[in-house]
A protein has these predicted regions:
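A generic transmembrane alpha-helix motif of multi-pass inner-membrane proteins
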Residues: 368, 372-398, 417-448
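Hydrophobic, membrane-embedded alpha-helices of multi-pass small-molecule transporters
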Residues: 14, 21-31, 107-111, 115, ...
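Membrane-embedded translocation segments of transport machinery
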Residues: 2-13, 180, 184-330, 354
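Hydrophobic alpha-helical segments of multi-pass membrane transport proteins
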Residues: 327-336, 355-366, 382-409
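Loop-to-transmembrane helix boundary motifs in multi-pass membrane proteins
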Residues: 18-19, 26, 157-158, 269-275, ...
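Helix-loop-helix connectors at the membrane interface of multi-pass transporters/channels
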Residues: 2, 118-151, 252-256, 261, ...
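Membrane-interface "cap" regions at the ends of multi-pass membrane proteins
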Residues: 1-34, 63-68, 72-98, 254-258, ...
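Inter-helical loop and helix-membrane interface segments of multi-pass membrane transporters/permeases
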Residues: 7-11, 39-43, 73-102, 115-176, ...
Length: 448
């Protein structure tokens, strides 16, 4: 709940740096690795990056700040945060609390789908170290068959269990002792390893063609509305505005911390991570003589495996790459499971470990059953439920909560208070953009 007595009992981040790193960890995920480079390649390098940067600035300075501030103001996850907003407007918490379960369930659904993907990632990380990946060589039929078997019904049971176990262990130690500590270890290593991969790939013959393409801008391409739509979609989903993860992490933030500054850092480092992935994958594909025309799991588990097996030092590259992917996945999945875990604690008074166990048992049971349809599962969640959660959070905070609550919440602890421009920008421009994400995603079969 959001009263002071209960807030004081809650776990939280020990430091501003820990909060920022954890939020970066939640944002840096598969979208940065298997979707962003594909979009950069498909839509013309810098032609795509320019609108992408603009949308990162817009969403980072509106939605990310807003969700952090909403969570901190309530001192709770989406259920109580939405209840706080309806109470501020109408004196009734119940309507907001009921609506707040939508993004919580969305977070759980996305976490379950992610659990399946993490099973694949752990399996391929193991194969990279035991020689299984390199043994396939460049036999595309064998590479495809291995992935198809992995992504089939009951195809990665052991590794799905491993994924759930890793998440459960980290989260059982709480926010400071588990989530913050894990992110402080994994995120710096991820960035360092990606930089190392980028340096190595840059030395490969033919890699320069990939870099040249990334930095090419075609002015005519900027007139294509689809470039802007997909750039917006990628920025929107990459920054993890969905009314759940950012809200719950914000609820653990000290009231003395500067939220606008934290949001800027999250947006900056998420973008750096995405660019690092592009600077590794696009030149690597160019060096391997392959075209980057397929995104999603196929890029990571089929085409990149084929390319890495054909390059000098490919066995080492594969090991480093899949460790990076595993770290990105773990730091994202613990954020996705946190909102439902925290909701059990807040609504039913469960202790941390039992609440974590209940959610992870549910996650494991469903994940094992949906392995063959996880792509369709993730499409439904990401196209409809996540944007809906973001829209509900935006409407609750900026429309129902009202200007006074918004500005007080955002400026609490701010080194330089945000001016009057922030509220109308969020209320009208940001809320409208979230609605666009929902409608465009439904119309185009996903934009992020």
């Amino acid at each position: 709940m959001s009263n002071d007595a209960n807030v004081s009992k809650r776990d939280g981040f020990r430091s501003r740096g820990g909060f920022i790193i954890a939020c970066i960890g939640s944002a840096v995920g598969m979208g940065n690795i298997w979707r962003f480079p594909t979009l950069v390649s498909k839509w013309g390098g810098m032609t795509f990056l320019l609108p992408y940067f603009l949308f990162v600035i817009l969403i980072g300075s509106t939605g990310v700040i807003g969700e952090f501030a909403l969570g901190r103001a309530a001192g709770a996850g989406p259920v109580d945060a939405f209840g706080m907003c309806t109470e501020a407007r109408w004196g009734k918490r119940r309507p907001g609390e009921l609506v707040g379960y939508i993004p919580v369930l969305g977070s759980l659904a996305l976490a379950i789908g992610y659990t399946c993907v993490m099973g694949w990632i752990f399996k391929y990380t193991f194969l990279a170290f035991d020689g299984g990946l390199s043994a396939m060589g460049q036999d595309m039929d064998g590479i495809v068959a291995t992935f198809n078997a992995t992504a089939s019904a009951w195809g990665a049971n052991v590794w799905v269990v491993v994924a759930v176990a890793v998440s459960f262990v980290i989260m059982s130690f709480g926010i400071a002792g588990g989530i913050e500590k894990a992110n402080k270890i994994m995120m710096p290593i991820l960035f360092l390893l990606f930089v190392g991969l980028g340096i190595y790939v840059a030395t490969l013959p033919g890699a320069s063609d990939g870099y040249r393409y990334i930095f090419t801008i075609k002015p005519a391409g900027l007139l294509d509305p689809y470039v802007w739509i997909y750039a917006f979609g990628q920025a929107f989903f990459s920054l993890s505005v969905a009314g759940n993860g950012s809200v719950i992490y914000g609820s653990y933030l000290s009231k003395s911390e500067c939220i606008p500054s934290s949001a800027r850092n999250v947006a900056l480092f998420d973008t750096i991570a995405a660019l690092l992935a592009a600077f590794v994958i696009i030149p690597a594909m160019a060096a391997g003589g392959a075209q980057l025309d397929a995104g999603g799991p196929g890029l990571m588990f089929i085409y990149l495996v084929h390319v890495m097996n054909g390059m000098a030092g490919g066995r080492i590259v594969a090991r480093v790459f899949f460790v990076c992917v595993a770290f990105a996945g773990v730091t994202s999945i613990i954020n996705l499971y946190e909102a439902p875990v925290a909701s059990l604690q807040e609504r039913f008074g469960l202790k941390r470990v039992p609440a974590t166990a209940v959610i992870h048992v549910i996650g494991l049971a469903v994940a094992l059953c949906i392995q063959a349809i996880v792509s369709q599962w993730m499409d439904v969640v990401s196209i409809y439920i996540c944007p809906l959660g973001a829209l509900l959070a935006a409407v609750m905070f900026f429309w129902i909560g009202g200007k006074k609550l918004v500005l007080e919440s955002v400026n609490l602890g701010a080194r330089k208070p945000i001016g009057g421009w922030y509220y109308p920008l969020c209320k009208y421009v940001y809320c409208a953009s979230v609605l666009v994400a929902l409608v465009a995603g439904a119309a185009l079969g996903g934009i992020g």
